[in-house]
Amino acid sequence: MSKPEIRALRMKMGFVFQGYNLFRNMTALQNVMEGLTTARKIPEAEAKKRAREVLDKVGMSDRENFYPDQLSGGQQQRVAIARAIAYNPEVILFDEPTSALDPEMVGEVLEIMKELAESGMTMIVVTHEMGFAKNVATRVMFIDEKVIMEENEPQEFFAHPKNARLREFLSKVN
């Protein structure tokens, strides 16, 4: 792929990192606006309006003027999700979005992700949250040592795993 093709593809994707990757010197609102104004060249007033809409969607409208160090891990991850959905991507990639969270915060982030899935958002999620995968995913893959060991619909994947390594894994996490 050429560099312009790669850039065009990236413009269709959102990405939520496990470590949030928020700019520490920017408020929640500014963090969401940054990609809109810098990469998308959206006028500031329009970017601010859109940023406020998505912060509201993830339950963070009351924290728009807070800096990352003033937010809990779950709140930071919700800002990261707002940033990812701000420009209406075709797909969002989630890299273990709950792994850096306190157990109490995991549920609120998973609930937002579930709402995104229910709204029709295509998501590729790397996760160890098997209950979430079982209840929300339309396809589940088990990858071990960089190899796809099994792929199936959630019910079949969890009820009748064909791969021995997957059966071993599921026996340890269930």
Which stretches of residues belong to each language-model region?
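ABC family nucleotide-binding domain
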Residues: 1-154
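C-terminal boundary and immediately downstream tail of ABC-type ATPase nucleotide-binding domains
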Residues: 144-145, 151, 155-174
